């Protein structure tokens, strides 16, 4: 299964690059006797549209059918990381400076705004206070919907 995921990642990465998109994640799993292949794509400059998902899905389906690396019948989905997307690296924090986020450390969970990122230090504003986190201190982070 790991080999399938790595092969699909390679193919999906090339397809995403053709459409000026980024590959965010690939998941291949069995749920209730059915196989699922989930491709999550991102656009570093804009939101992901249904057309983006459709383009990647059609091209990926065509390429996967040609090489036939997946032995089981599967359901293919292509989607965006979503509104509550995970923040997985310093680059994500830089990209989403000014946005509302949730940061979990070993000690606490904070909800606030990403204010600045310099040398792997994230400055975060929560309840009118500024807190600095080393990226390594963050156990989990994601964007939050700002209403």
UniProtKB/Swiss-Prot annotation:
Keyword Cytoplasm: yes
UniProt family annotation: Belongs to the RimP family.
SUPFAM superfamilies for this protein: YhbC-like, C-terminal domain, YhbC-like, N-terminal domain
Annotated Gene Ontology cellular component terms: cytosol
PANTHER family the UniProt entry points to: RIBOSOME MATURATION FACTOR RIMP
Chief place of localization: cytoplasm
Job description of the protein: Required for maturation of 30S ribosomal subunits.
Keyword terms of this UniProt record: Cytoplasm, Ribosome biogenesis
The protein's name: Ribosome maturation factor RimP
Entry keyword Cytoplasm: yes
The gene coding this protein: rimP
